[in-house]
UniProtKB/Swiss-Prot annotation:
Swiss-Prot/TrEMBL GO biological process terms: rRNA processing
Organism whose genome encodes this protein: Haloarcula marismortui (strain ATCC 43049 / DSM 3752 / JCM 8966 / VKM B-1809) (Halobacterium marismortui)
Record HAMAP family: RNA_binding_AU_1
Molecular function (Gene Ontology), one example: RNA endonuclease activity, producing 5'-phosphomonoesters
Known role: Probable RNase involved in rRNA stability through maturation and/or degradation of precursor rRNAs. Binds to RNA in loop regions with AU-rich sequences.
Name of the featured protein: Probable ribonuclease FAU-1
Keywords: Endonuclease, Hydrolase, Nuclease, RNA-binding, rRNA processing
Enzyme Commission no: 3.1.26.-
Family in the record: Belongs to the FAU-1 family.
Residues covered by the S1 motif domain: 90-152
Pfam families per UniProt: DUF402, S1
Length: 466
């Protein structure tokens, strides 16, 4: 039996379900990293998804398979409670509109109420209307939400969906050509729509998924063919849909899940208890566990790799240079796009320069199309910026000597120590602004020990560039 698992309980539930002999499929990236062996990208008979409030999970799928998963999960602890949904996902109803709200209508289904967004109906919806609807998103019983409805009848899956009344493959990930590559056809009167996950699935897996969807479509056809029109029978259920069960995890159950997860990866006490409480706290849990999981990083004073993976900066984002001055001012040297983030603490950013004037100490003009590439490294007393023109030709390098760089999620901060080193396009190297450093010492802005450190760094950088 195949199961797809998502949410904050995924690691523990993947372990539990695999031990119970079930095959976990369509695993997320972190799950693939934590477990040995490959996970197939094929149709899931059951999907286990964490609820939006993270208090439990929904188990949705084929009836026998969902029952087996539910039975295993209810064994977690005595405070795991479960309820079958009276308006299960995929169920089809003749319903009566009882109220119209700002964005949709409330529909009496007989088994309960549902919410039909106006965008999910091709026709105008008014109070008193009767119409055929399908549950597309079920709602846990402990929430205030109603199940979400749609007037389009479909067999919805993570690899593909079949839409009743369509006659062709819907353009998308696979498009019509996909049907030429697999050994299956959609049921007559139904069109297939390929989901993004189908890109990673094998042709055999797609064919099997389409066969299963066809079986479900046949059951729907049998329920609807010859059935009374909604105006003659509402409210009533035409088709029972997929098994939908909600499980609430209590405190004991969450701690039991901690123990299971701990068999797979570093897990702090109360992992699931904390994560269930707040999304911000969830991020803190991930951070702490990442520190514990990889202590041998070679980082002696600061866990840079873990911190940036959790909070940034990240490739494609932006990072500014918070250029402090010894007199207490702070100048922001623009934002650059992050090109790379290395575990050793190095972040590379690029900035496009505005034309006009010349580059400090280099004496070359700033021109349209110029690019500045800056490499900052956590804890280093200097950083280089290489200037290139629009053709990629180097115009010069400016090395700023500063207090040790600190790289925060959105800015790299330091205090400029005045003395700098430049390397011209012709290879000439010079040290500049020693007089400004001396003046800052005289004014009391920089201590003599700090100034001596700056001079030592500048000398070492100059020697390395020559």
């Amino acid at each position: 039996m195949t199961v797809r698992v998502r949410g904050i309980y995924a690691t523990a539930l993947t372990r539990l379900l695999r031990e119970a002999g079930h095959e976990v499929v369509q695993a997320s990236g972190p799950i693939e990293d934590r477990f040995d062996g490959e996970f197939a990208d094929e149709r899931a008979a059951v999907t286990v998804t964490t609820t939006d409030d993270q208090q439990g999970v929904g188990v949705i799928g084929d009836h026998d398979a969902a029952a087996a998963v539910t039975d295993r999960l209810t064994e977690l602890g005595r405070d795991t409670l479960h309820w079958s949904d009276p308006t299960p996902e995929g169920a089809i109803y003749a319903g009566t509109v009882t109220d119209t709200l700002g964005s949709g209508a409330v529909v009496d289904l007989g088994d309960g109420e549902g919410f039909l967004p106006y965008s999910s109906s091709d026709e105008r919806v008014e109070t008193g209307d009767t119409l055929r609807v399908q549950v597309v998103e079920a709602s846990a019983p402990w929430t205030d939400g109603r199940p979400v409805l749609d007037t389009t009848v479909a067999v919805r899956g993570s690899l593909l969906s079949l839409v009743r009344g369509e006659t062709a493959s819907t353009p998308g990930t696979g498009g019509p050509a996909m049907l030429d590559l697999i050994a299956a056809e959609p049921r007559d009167g139904w069109g297939v729509s390929w989901e993004s996950a189908s890109e990673d699935a094998s042709f055999d897996a797609l064919a099997a998924a389409l066969d299963a969807a066809n079986d479900r479509a046949a059951a729907i056809d049998a329920s609807l063919d010859g059935a009374d029109a909604p105006e003659d029978c509402a409210p009533t259920r035409y088709d029972e849909g997929r098994s939908t069960v909600w499980l609430w995890f209590g405190r004991e159950s969450r701690f039991a899940l901690d123990e299971v997860r701990r068999e797979v990866t570093s897990t702090m006490p109360g992992h699931h208890r904390v994560k269930a409480g707040d999304r911000a706290a969830s991020a803190a849990v991930d951070y702490v566990e990442a520190l514990c999981d990889d202590p041998e990083t070679g980082e002696t004073d600061f866990p840079f790799a873990v911190t940036t993976r959790q909070f940034g900066p990240q490739v494609g984002g932006s990072l500014s240079l918070g250029h402090g001055k010894p007199d207490g001012r702070l100048i922001t040297l623009g934002n650059g796009e992050v090109q790379s983030v290395d575990d050793d603490g190095t972040v590379t950013i690029e900035r496009e320069m505005s034309p006009g004037g010349t580059y400090d100490a280099l004496g070359v003009p700033k021109e349209a199309g110029d690019i500045a590439e800056t490499k900052v490294k956590e804890g280093r007393w200097w950083y280089p910026t290489v200037y290139r023109d629009s053709d990629g030709e180097k115009k010069g390098t400016y090395v700023n000597v500063c207090t040790p760089v600190e790289i925060f999620p959105d800015t790299a901060r330091y205090v400029d120590l005045h003395v700098d080193v430049v390397k011209h396009a012709d290879g000439a190297v010079e040290r500049v602004d020693d007089d400004e450093l001396d003046a800052a010492v005289e004014r009391g802005h920089i201590s003599e020990p700090l100034a001596e450190r700056a001079r030592s760094v500048a000398a070492a950088v100059k020697s390395a560039l020559e």
